Amino acid sequence: MGQVLPVFAHCKEAPSTASSTPDSTEGGNDDSDFRELHTAREFSEEDEEETTSQDWGTPRELTFSYIAFDGVVGSGGRRDSTARRPRPQGRSVSEPRDQHPQPSLGDSLESIPSLSQSPEPGRRGDPDTAPPSERPLEDLRLRLDHLGWVARGTGSGEDSSTSSSTPLEDEEPQEPNRLETGEAGEELDLRLRLAQPSSPEVLTPQLSPGSGTPQAGTPSPSRSRDSNSGPEEPLLEEEEKQWGPLEREPVRGQCLDSTDQLEFTVEPRLLGTAMEWLKTSLLLAVYKTVPILELSPPLWTAIGWVQRGPTPPTPVLRVLLKWAKSPRSSGVPSLSLGADMGSKVADLLYWKDTRTSGVVFTGLMVSLLCLLHFSIVSVAAHLALLLLCGTISLRVYRKVLQAVHRGDGANPFQAYLDVDLTLTREQTERLSHQITSRVVSAATQLRHFFLVEDLVDSLKLALLFYILTFVGAIFNGLTLLILGVIGLFTIPLLYRQHQAQIDQYVGLVTNQLSHIKAKIRAKIPGTGALASAAAAVSGSKAKAE
C-alpha cells in the first residue's frame, strides 16, 4: 500500500474548486493536506482481495488515474475545456495546494476501470497476457472505456461543489450508477469488437482548407458536458436506424462527405457490406462524444483514421466528333481534301442540287463537243476570251455607275478576291502525302503488271488492251469521254430509282461470267479440280440468289 501515496500526489495536480462540504476528520490529521488518505486506505483494504499493489503502481494506471481525476474535478464546466486547461508553471508534482481536495475522491477512484480491474488472466486490461499485436487495440479500448465512465459520472448531475457527504457516505448510493456505467462500457466494447473485422481504412479525416492542424481549442457546441446527459446508446441507435435498411445489400464505391463540428472533413470510403457502415456510425459517435480523440492523433491511426489532403479532381476526357455529320451540312472544315472532294462529286452525280448538277453537266458536254470538232488550243483560247469579256464588262459597268453617282464603284468580285487560298503547313503536308502515296501506288502497280510479277495478272492486262484495240477502231477518245460523262450523270440516278431490278440483272451476268471462266480453266491442263470447285461455288451462289 506504499504506492498509493504517489498516486494521490499525482492526482493532486488537477485543478479543483472550493468545496462547500465540511472537512472530514475521521481517520485524518488536521495538519495534513491529504485529508482523505484514510478513506482511500479503507477503500483499498476492502478491495485488497481483488487487486494488488502492483496494479496500482503501473505507469498505465497512473496515467488513467490522472486523466480520470482531472475529468471529474472539472465537472462544473465542460469536460473538453477542462481537459485543455494548462498546467501551472513552476510547481512540482508533490507540492501541496491551499484549496481543499474534492470529497468524492473515493468515488472517483472506484469509477476508474484500470484501478479496479481483476487480476484474472486474459482480461483486456492486463498487458502481460495480451498478444503484442493486440496491445495498441487494447490500449484504445481501455481509453474508450475510461472515457465512457467519466462521461457518465460527469453527466449524472452530481456536482462536487454542492455535495455534502463524505466519500464513504457516497459509496453506497453510487453502486447502481457503477453497475449502469459498467454495462454501458461493456456494450460499447462489444460494438467495437463487432466492428473490428472490417477494413481499417474506413474513415479518412481531411482538414478543411485553412484549418491546418486539428484545433484543440474549438469546443463542441452541440453537447454540454455539465448537463444531465444520458448514455450514448440513443445516439448510436439513431445511427443504426439511419443505416439499418442498407444492411441487406453491399455498397460499392460510394463516397459520403460529411463535415463534423471541428472543421474536419470525414470521408468514409465504404467498399464492403453493411458491417463497415456500422463501424462508421460507431466511430463517428465516439469521436463526437469523446473530445480527447481530437487531442490524440495516434488514436486516429489506431481506429483507421488517416490524415489525407484533398483529392484532386478527376480530369474529364472530352472528345470532339468533327465528323458526326457530313462536312457539307455541318460546315466543319474538311479533314482531308480528298474526302471533301468525294462528297461534292457524290452530290453532283446524285443530283442533290439540281441547278448545280445541271450547270456542271451542261458545261462539260459543251466543252467536250467543242473539242470534238476543234483543236484543244483554239477551244482553250476561246473559253478564256469569253470569261474575260464577262468579268471586264461587269467591272466597267460598276465604274460607269460610280461616274454617274449611282454606285460606289466597288469590284463586283471582291468577295472572291478576299477568299484566302493559301494552304497551311498541315494542309500542305497532307496533300503532299496523298499525292506521293498515289504516285507510288501507281508506279508499284505498273511494275507489277509489266514486269510480270504475277503471270495471271499480266495476262489479264494484255487481254484488256487487246479488247481496247477494237474499241479504238470504232470510237474516238473524245467520244468515249463524252459517253463516260453521260454515264456518270445518269447511271447513279437510275440505280437509286431501280436498285432491285438492276441488282438482279447484275447477278445473272456475274453468274454467266463465272461459268465461262470455269469452262476456260477446265480446258487448261492441271486446273480441273480448281475449275470444278469454282463451278460448284458459283452454282451454289446462283441458287441462293
From Swiss-Prot:
Record field: compositional bias (Basic and acidic residues): 32-43, 135-146
Highest taxon in the source lineage: Eukaryota
GO-annotated biological processes: brain development; endoplasmic reticulum tubular network formation; gene expression; intracellular protein transmembrane transport; negative regulation of amyloid-beta formation; neuron differentiation; regulation of D-glucose import
Record bears the keyword Transferase: no
Membrane-traversing stretches: 368-388, 463-483
Effect noted on mutating S367F: In SPG12; uncertain significance
Effect of G77D: In SPG12; uncertain significance
Amino acid composition bias (Polar residues), ranges on this chain: 199-230
Biased composition (Low complexity): 14-25, 157-166
GO cellular component: cell surface; endoplasmic reticulum; endoplasmic reticulum membrane; intermediate filament; neuron projection; postsynaptic density; sarcoplasmic reticulum membrane; T-tubule
Modification type Phosphoserine: residues: S44, S227, S229
Function text: Inhibits amyloid precursor protein processing, probably by blocking BACE1 activity. Enhances trafficking of the glutamate transporter SLC1A1/EAAC1 from the endoplasmic reticulum to the cell surface. Plays a role in the translocation of SLC2A4/GLUT4 from intracellular membranes to the cell membrane which facilitates the uptake of glucose into the cell.
Illness the protein is tied to: Spastic paraplegia 12, autosomal dominant: A form of spastic paraplegia, a neurodegenerative disorder characterized by a slow, gradual, progressive weakness and spasticity of the lower limbs. Rate of progression and the severity of symptoms are quite variable. Initial symptoms may include difficulty with balance, weakness and stiffness in the legs, muscle spasms, and dragging the toes when walking. In some forms of the disorder, bladder symptoms (such as incontinence) may appear, or the weakness and stiffness may spread to other parts of the body. Neuronopathy, distal hereditary motor, autosomal recessive 11, with spasticity: A form of distal hereditary motor neuronopathy, a heterogeneous group of neuromuscular diseases caused by selective degeneration of motor neurons in the anterior horn of the spinal cord, without sensory deficit in the posterior horn. HMNR11 is an autosomal recessive form characterized by slowly progressive muscle weakness in the distal upper and lower limbs, lower limb spasticity and hyperreflexia, with onset in the first decade of life.
Protein known as: Reticulon-2
Lineage: Eukaryota, Metazoa, Chordata, Craniata, Vertebrata
